Every structure is written in structure tokens, then in C-alpha cells.
Regions:
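Secondary-structure boundary elements
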Residues: 139-143, 196-204
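Extended, charge-rich low-complexity interaction segments
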Residues: 199-226
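Compositionally biased, intrinsically disordered low-complexity regions
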Residues: 14, 176, 225-226
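Feature targets compositionally biased, intrinsically disordered low-complexity regions
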Residues: 58, 173, 182-185, 206, ...
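Short, flexible loop segments at boundaries between secondary-structure elements
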Residues: 72-80, 165-198
Length: 226
């Protein structure tokens, strides 16, 4: 019988990984590094990237199930046809990612590698990888604010609080923000209000934008209700 390969752990997910797995992990890292801001204003955190490399957020993604509604709700427009009618789909998506970067946004993953279907439950992944994420936040990302995305990150929110990040968490009534879903107007209103509630800082570098709305504008987005 042929012996099982003795694979080393992947530093992205902590699990034994084949050379093919490591190569894909490095490719995802390369894609995300292209759009990482020098100073991260809002760090969005989701559980894991898409299963297909072609659908990686920073690819940019071929599938728009997450990509399009996420950037739409951040009011990063898809394309100005009058200004540049010749742009193709890839160029348009890349321009949106560049604007995402320009605003100081960054999307990070608890597990930097996809979680296979029928893999471990989210709670297990969170318990296993949260110490690594917390180290990355503290010593690498150093964001001004953290916005967890997805209700499956419930236990991660508590761990981030215990780690001392409570004052910079952007939440919905104490919970992680809902993950993007196409056509869900209620989610879009909720997400916009939560991110818009992040107060501006006086020490933002030149050209560094963030969502800043007045109370009146916030009420208008919420349908005119206070």
C-alpha cells in the first residue's frame, strides 16, 4: 500500500496541504496584496474565500454573487459608460477594486483558504483560527475599524471583544453584519447604516476616503425615520 504524503500545514488555513493547495493559496495572496491599502480604515472579515479561485474577490470574481452587492452597498459604482465606454467587464471590476482600496477598505478571511463542502463547521474553524486572525489584526492589518460579515461569525465577535477590539468593531445590534445577498434591499439599508455610523478620524492621510454621512443623510437612507 502506498504511504500517505506527509504534508506540512498551510499557513492560510492551518491544515495539511498539498503543493497544489499551497500554490493556490499563494495565488490568492498575490491577488489580495495588489489591492491592499497602505493604511486599512475598515477591515471586513468573512469566514473563508470562495471555493473556486476564479471567484476570488480580488480576482476580480467571475461570480458576482458576493462581489457586486458588496461593492454596490458601499456605493462604489460599476461603470461610467460616458467617461469610458470601451472598458470590458474585467477592467470595470478591477476599477471598482481600485476604488475599494482607495477608500481604505480591505477584505480579509478567517481561513485564508476555502473550506471544502461538508468540511468542519464554522464554530470549529473560528475556535481553531481566531488566534491567528487576532495576531494578524494586531500586528499586520492594524485597522481603524473591524466589520465582521456573516452571522456564522457570531462566536468570533465575542473573541474579538475579549482580545480588546470592542471599541473598533462595526456591528449590527452587537452581531456581525449580514453577508451580502443580491437584491436584498433590507440588507443594503442595514449595512449602509452600520458602516456609515463609523465616525471619521482627523488623521486620515491625503486621498484616503471613508463613508461619512450626516445624521440627516443617514435618516434619509433609513427611509426618513430616526
Amino acid at each position: 500500500m502506498e504511504a500517505s504524503p506527509n504534508y506540512l500545514p498551510c499557513d492560510g488555513c492551518g491544515l495539511p496541504a498539498s503543493p497544489e493547495h499551497i500554490a493556490e493559496r499563494l495565488r490568492r495572496l498575490e491577488l489580495s496584496t495588489r489591492y491592499r491599502p497602505v493604511h486599512i480604515g475598515v477591515l471586513f472579515v468573512v469566514l473563508a474565500p470562495s471555493l473556486r479561485l476564479e471567484d476570488d474577490f480580488y480576482g476580480p470574481a467571475e461570480s458576482k454573487e458576493f462581489f457586486a452587492p458588496f461593492l454596490d452597498v458601499l456605493e462604489i459604482p460599476p461603470h461610467d459608460e460616458k467617461a469610458a465606454p470601451e472598458l470590458d467587464a474585467l477592467a470595470i471590476a478591477s476599477a471598482r477594486l481600485a476604488e475599494f482600496q482607495h477608500r481604505g477598505y480591505y477584505l480579509a478571511y478567517l481561513s485564508e483558504c476555502p473550506i471544502p463542502e461538508n468540511g468542519e463547521p464554522p464554530a470549529t474553524t473560528i475556535a481553531r483560527l481566531s488566534p491567528t486572525l487576532i495576531r494578524r489584526i494586531r500586528f499586520n492589518y492594524k485597522p481603524k475599524y473591524i466589520a465582521p460579515l456573516g452571522q456564522e461569525l457570531f462566536s468570533l465577535v465575542d473573541l474579538l471583544r475579549v482580545a480588546g477590539f470592542e471599541s473598533i468593531l462595526t456591528l449590527d445590534q452587537g452581531l456581525a453584519l449580514p453577508s451580502p445577498s443580491t437584491g436584498d434591499r433590507g440588507w443594503m439599508d442595514l449595512f449602509q447604516k452600520a458602516v456609515a455610523s463609523v465616525p471619521p478620524r482627523d488623521n486620515l492621510s491625503s486621498g484616503y476616503d471613508r463613508i461619512q454621512v450626516t445624521s440627516a443623510e443617514r435618516d434619509l437612507r433609513a427611509g426618513g425615520h430616526s
